[in-house]
């Protein structure tokens, strides 16, 4: 399809959707569906109109170049318009890129220590807090779903729901293995230790996204335990949900209520099943496009935090920042912005722009 034809079809569809919404003949479900479509089309149409307006102004200025009295003014106007066109064209191309349906969603964050013992658990706790601060800076709601500590106040497992607009779009690049290099507080010889933490960021799934049959679930209840293994209450409030077809297991004991723990576990289960479907779809598409930043593979080492050097390096794009204190304080924007630009560049190339 020719580029101009594609633009005309988008504008025509936007006008059609607007007319349907104004007809007063839609069911509530249809109106909601069309409202979502219109919200997606509106920024694309705005980019199309801005680019077309600039092209029309350019043509008008060029037409005046043959008029001796208007030539100087036309040349000035033409220079101004041509200076804006590259940015308008780039914005239009970005607007036309295929959208990840999950980008606008809230997200579920999961953090676990991997290699490195107690030091990995301590860094996992620090990273969990860093994402909490990043969420607060963005005005998102950070709700702890599960927070299990080890014996040295490190983290055995942390889960949180991060609610807000475009949370997944910003945090999806964080999935993977995060490596930390530093001297542990218990190290008397001053030797640098290397530890790793795994981070998973999943788009929050609604019940309509994933079908979970009760017959496919095994629900076990047990007494919640603390860091040392001791029982912390006398009732069986902890819940373990096993999805037998997939083998996915979710255990939850953060709440004192068995009902609340089960609801949280089901929320995590839906997100993991939804992400599994997305991963299968991504694997199919990956054959056509080698992506450096968009894999979301939690086994991939993506970043190193070197405390003695004050350095954070993202290995996917070879970005190094000597701002470790600020990043651990929740300032991830510079890294995420760079990763976003890299993926946009990959997508633009794949689309032939």
Curated annotation (Swiss-Prot):
<dbReference type="InterPro" id="IPR050057">
    <property type="entry name" value="Prokaryotic/Mito_RF"/>
</dbReference>
<dbReference type="GO" id="GO:0005737">
    <property type="term" value="C:cytoplasm"/>
</dbReference>
<dbReference type="Pfam" id="PF03462">
    <property type="entry name" value="PCRF"/>
</dbReference>
<dbReference type="GO" id="GO:0016149">
    <property type="term" value="F:translation release factor activity, codon specific"/>
</dbReference>
<feature type="modified residue" description="N5-methylglutamine">
    <location>
        <position position="230"/>
    </location>
</feature>
<keyword id="KW-0648">Protein biosynthesis</keyword>
<comment type="similarity">
    <text>Belongs to the prokaryotic/mitochondrial release factor family.</text>
</comment>
<protein>
    <recommendedName>
        <fullName>Peptide chain release factor 1</fullName>
    </recommendedName>
</protein>
<dbReference type="InterPro" id="IPR045853">
    <property type="entry name" value="Pep_chain_release_fac_I_sf"/>
</dbReference>
<comment type="function">
    <text>Peptide chain release factor 1 directs the termination of translation in response to the peptide chain termination codons UAG and UAA.</text>
</comment>
<dbReference type="InterPro" id="IPR000352">
    <property type="entry name" value="Pep_chain_release_fac_I"/>
</dbReference>
<dbReference type="Pfam" id="PF00472">
    <property type="entry name" value="RF-1"/>
</dbReference>
<keyword id="KW-0963">Cytoplasm</keyword>
<keyword id="KW-0488">Methylation</keyword>
<dbReference type="InterPro" id="IPR005139">
    <property type="entry name" value="PCRF"/>
</dbReference>
<dbReference type="InterPro" id="IPR004373">
    <property type="entry name" value="RF-1"/>
</dbReference>
């Amino acid at each position: 399809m020719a580029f101009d034809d594609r633009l005309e079809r988008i504008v025509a569809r936007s006008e059609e959707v607007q007319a349907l919404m104004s007809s007063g003949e839609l069911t509530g479900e249809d109106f909601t569906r069309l409202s979502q479509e219109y919200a997606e089309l509106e920024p694309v149409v705005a980019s199309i109109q801005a680019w077309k307006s600039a092209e029309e102004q350019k043509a008008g200025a060029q037409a005046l170049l043959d008029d001796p009295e208007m030539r100087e003014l036309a040349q000035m106007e033409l220079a101004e318009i041509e200076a804006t066109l590259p940015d308008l064209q780039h914005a239009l191309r970005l607007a036309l890129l295929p959208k990840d349906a999950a980008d606008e969603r809230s997200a579920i964050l999961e953090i676990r220590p991997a290699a490195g013992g107690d030091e990995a658990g301590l860094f996992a706790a620090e990273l969990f807090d860093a994402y909490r601060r990043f969420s607060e800076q963005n005005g998102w709601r950070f709700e702890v779903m599960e927070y299990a500590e080890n014996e040295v106040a490190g983290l055995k497992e942390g889960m949180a729901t991060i609610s807000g607009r475009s949370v997944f779009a910003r945090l999806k690049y964080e999935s993977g293995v995060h490596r930390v290099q530093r001297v542990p507080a218990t190290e008397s010889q001053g030797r640098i230790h290397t530890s790793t933490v795994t981070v998973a960021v999943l788009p929050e799934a609604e019940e309509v996204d994933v079908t979970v049959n009760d017959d496919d679930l095994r629900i076990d209840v047990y007494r919640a335990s603390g860091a040392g293994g001791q029982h912390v209450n006398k009732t069986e409030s902890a819940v373990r949900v096993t999805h037998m077809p997939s083998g996915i297991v979710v255990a939850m004991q953060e709440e004192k209520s068995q009902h609340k723990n089960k609801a949280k576990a089901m929320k995590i289960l839906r997100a993991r099943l939804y992400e599994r479907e997305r991963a299968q779809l991504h694997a199919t598409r990956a054959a056509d496009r080698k992506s450096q930043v968009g894999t979301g593979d939690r086994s991939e080492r993506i970043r190193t935090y070197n405390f003695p050097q004050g350095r954070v390096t993202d290995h996917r794009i070879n970005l190094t920042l000597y701002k470790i204190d600020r990043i651990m304080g929740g300032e991830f924007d510079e890294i995420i912005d760079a990763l976003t630009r890299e993926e946009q560049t990959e997508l633009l190339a794949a689309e032939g722009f």
